[in-house]
Amino acid sequence: MAVVVRVVYCGAUGYKPKYLQLKKKLEDEFPSRLDICGEGTPQVTGFFEVFVAGKLVHSKKGGDGYVDTESKFLKLVAAIKAALAQA
């Protein structure tokens, strides 16, 4: 069963490339195990929020910034592994 990863990002801020980069990296890490969807906001929000199985695990608005370091990526990997174990 695929784990749903949802990314809400600021479309008006031009964050789509950051979303696509994260999507590819996650797909490479978990081939055929994830259902990844992205939603760009039409207005300026500053969002880059990542939800794993409905739970917020990364929030730019909450102070996490972008998923731009290995430690931030590994935090997502850990959340996905936990969700896969429960599925």
UniProtKB/Swiss-Prot annotation:
The modification S-glutathionyl cysteine is found at C37. It holds the Pfam family Rdx. One of its GO terms (cellular component) is cytosol. Detected in muscle, heart, tongue, brain, lung, spleen, kidney and liver. Highest levels expressed in muscle and heart whereas lowest levels detected in liver (at protein level). It is found in: Cytoplasm. One of its GO terms (molecular function) is antioxidant activity. The keyword Cytoplasm applies. InterPro entries: Selenoprotein_Rdx-typ, SelW_related, Thioredoxin-like_sf. It comes from the Eukaryota. Its main location: cytoplasm. Induction: Up-regulated by dietary selenium. There is a cross-link at C10-U13 (Cysteinyl-selenocysteine (Cys-Sec)). The keyword Cytoplasm applies. Keywords: Antioxidant, Cytoplasm, Glutathionylation, Redox-active center, Selenocysteine. GO terms for biological process: erythrocyte differentiation; response to lipopolysaccharide; response to stress. Interacts with DPYSL2, PRDX1, YWHAB, YWHAG, HSP70 and HSP90. Belongs to the SelWTH family. Selenoprotein W subfamily. Plays a role as a glutathione (GSH)-dependent antioxidant. May be involved in a redox-related process. May play a role in the myopathies of selenium deficiency. NCBIfam families: CXXU_selWTH (TIGR02174). This is Selenoprotein W. The lineage of its organism: Eukaryota, Metazoa, Chordata, Craniata, Vertebrata.
